[in-house]
From Swiss-Prot:
Protein name per Swiss-Prot or TrEMBL: Omega-conotoxin CVID
Organism per entry: Conus catus
Pfam families: Conotoxin (PF02950)
Record's keyword annotation contains Coiled coil: no
Disulfide linkage: 46-61, 53-65, 60-72
Length: 73
C-alpha cells in the first residue's frame, strides 16, 4: 500500500514538473524541426501535384495519391 502511494505521488510530481516546464518554454525554441512532410519532400524524390502516382508507393510530395487514375493531390 505504501509503495502504491509513493508511486502515485511520484507520477503526480513528475507530471506537474512537465506541465510547468512546458508552459515556461512555450515560444522560446530557436531551431524548430522541420515538419515530417517537409523532411520527406527534401530527402527523397517525390512527385508534384497532378503527377501520376501509385497508392502503394507513397511517392507524392503532398503525401496523398487519389482518384481512379492515381494523381498526386
Amino acid at each position: 500500500m505504501k509503495l502504491t502511494c509513493v508511486v502515485i505521488v511520484a507520477v503526480l510530481l513528475l507530471t506537474a514538473c512537465q506541465l510547468i516546464t512546458a508552459d515556461d518554454s512555450r515560444g522560446t525554441q530557436k531551431h524548430r524541426a522541420l515538419r515530417s512532410d517537409t523532411k520527406l519532400s527534401m530527402s527523397t524524390r517525390c512527385k508534384s501535384k497532378g503527377a501520376k502516382c501509385s497508392k502503394l508507393m507513397y511517392d507524392c510530395c503532398s503525401g496523398s495519391c487519389s482518384g481512379t487514375v492515381g494523381r498526386c493531390g
